[in-house]
């Protein structure tokens, strides 16, 4: 995925929804929900989307969201309301219409 949004791709419905909750949204400019285009000409893994999010939407410290090529411990990831552990984690192949939810379970005190 690159950082350009192709109007043809969006009009064809080849997008996913990415949502941040539990404080994770503060790392993305306070925006809770983003519609992200998919490249319909190739298979896109969740791992690739994580890098795209880091490189294109992340406004906070990358270390608070990612650790190496995955999300850091303390961030729950749900794919269409199912724990990503059951879906293959970073090897999950994104599908048009997917809803990916990141929930931070780490709170300062």
UniProtKB/Swiss-Prot annotation:
GO cellular component: cytosol
Gene3D superfamilies: 3.10.20.30
Cross-link annotation Glycyl lysine isopeptide (Gly-Lys) (interchain with K-? in acceptor proteins), location: 109
Family in the record: Belongs to the URM1 family.
Keyword tRNA processing annotated: yes
Modified residues (1-thioglycine): 109
Family matches, as PANTHER family: RURM1 PROTEIN (PTHR14986)
GO BP: protein urmylation; tRNA thio-modification; tRNA wobble uridine modification
Disulfide feature: none
Pathway(s) this gene product operates in, as recorded in its UniProt entry: tRNA modification; 5-methoxycarbonylmethyl-2-thiouridine-tRNA biosynthesis
tRNA processing among keywords: yes
Function in brief: Acts as a sulfur carrier required for 2-thiolation of mcm(5)S(2)U at tRNA wobble positions of cytosolic tRNA(Lys), tRNA(Glu) and tRNA(Gln). Serves as sulfur donor in tRNA 2-thiolation reaction by being thiocarboxylated (-COSH) at its C-terminus by MOCS3. The sulfur is then transferred to tRNA to form 2-thiolation of mcm(5)S(2)U. Also acts as a ubiquitin-like protein (UBL) that is covalently conjugated via an isopeptide bond to lysine residues of target proteins.
Name of this chain's protein: Ubiquitin-related modifier 1 homolog
PTM notes: C-terminal thiocarboxylation occurs in 2 steps, it is first acyl-adenylated (-COAMP) via the hesA/moeB/thiF part of the MOCS3 homolog, then thiocarboxylated (-COSH) via the rhodanese domain of the MOCS3 homolog.
Cellular localization per UniProt: Cytoplasm
Entry keywords, A to Z: Cytoplasm, Isopeptide bond, tRNA processing, Ubl conjugation pathway
């Amino acid at each position: 995925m690159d950082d350009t949004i192709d109007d043809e791709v969006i009009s064809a419905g080849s997008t996913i929804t990415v949502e941040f909750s539990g404080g994770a949204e503060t790392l993305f400019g306070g925006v809770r929900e983003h519609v992200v285009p998919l490249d319909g000409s190739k298979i896109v893994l969740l791992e690739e989307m994580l890098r795209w999010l880091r490189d294109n939407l992340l406004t906070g410290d990358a270390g608070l969201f990612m650790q190496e090529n995955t999300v850091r411990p303390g961030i729950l990831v749900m794919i269409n309301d199912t724990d990503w552990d059951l879906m293959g984690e970073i090897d999950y192949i994104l599908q048009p219409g997917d809803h990916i939810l990141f929930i931070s379970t780490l709170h300062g005190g």
